Amino acid sequence: MTIRSVAKACGVAVGTVYNYFSGKEEFAALVLLTRWKKTTEHIDSVARECAEPETLVRCIYQELCAYMDQYRVLFQDEAAIAVFTASFARYHELLRAQLAKPVRPLCQNDFEAEFVAEALLTWTVAGEGFDEIYQVIRKILN
């Protein structure tokens, strides 16, 4: 992804894009953040309405998969990977906390909620299937 390709896709001049964004990193971050907010809002909504642990954990898994699928091209872009790698440590803790929040009522303590969130985040990104992940998470939630 380049600012030039973004400008072309939007039908505007490259300079116009730079009027709003300092570079492709800022543009990509805004796009990712906008979708991530929708993802967490949906997860929180399901958590409020759902008493069944498997349903909630499946929702989180499916939302993570959908998010990654939507931005797969961006996650494969070498320049984008360099940017994400540089900021990963800073944002990973925040992502984990956001995913731990809806599962906290299912857990005995904050550590378990963070552990479940980390497992979901890590193993979903690694491509593991829901059934394999949930077999382990179910033991923590019981």
Describe these PLM feature segments:
Residues 59, 69, 82-114, 128-132:
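Amphipathic alpha-helical packing segments from all-alpha helical-bundle domains
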Residues 9, 26-46, 55, 59-66, ...:
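Alpha-helical structural segments
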Residues 38-42, 67-71, 75, 98, ...:
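A short secondary-structure junction motif
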Residues 55-59, 63, 111-119, 135-136:
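Amphipathic alpha-helical interaction segments
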Residues 5, 51-56:
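A conserved beta-strand->loop->alpha-helix hinge within the catalytic CA
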Residues 1-26, 30:
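Helix-turn-helix
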Residues 38-49, 115-126:
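Solvent-exposed, amphipathic alpha-helical segments
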Residues 44, 76-85:
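Short linear capping/connector segments at secondary-structure termini
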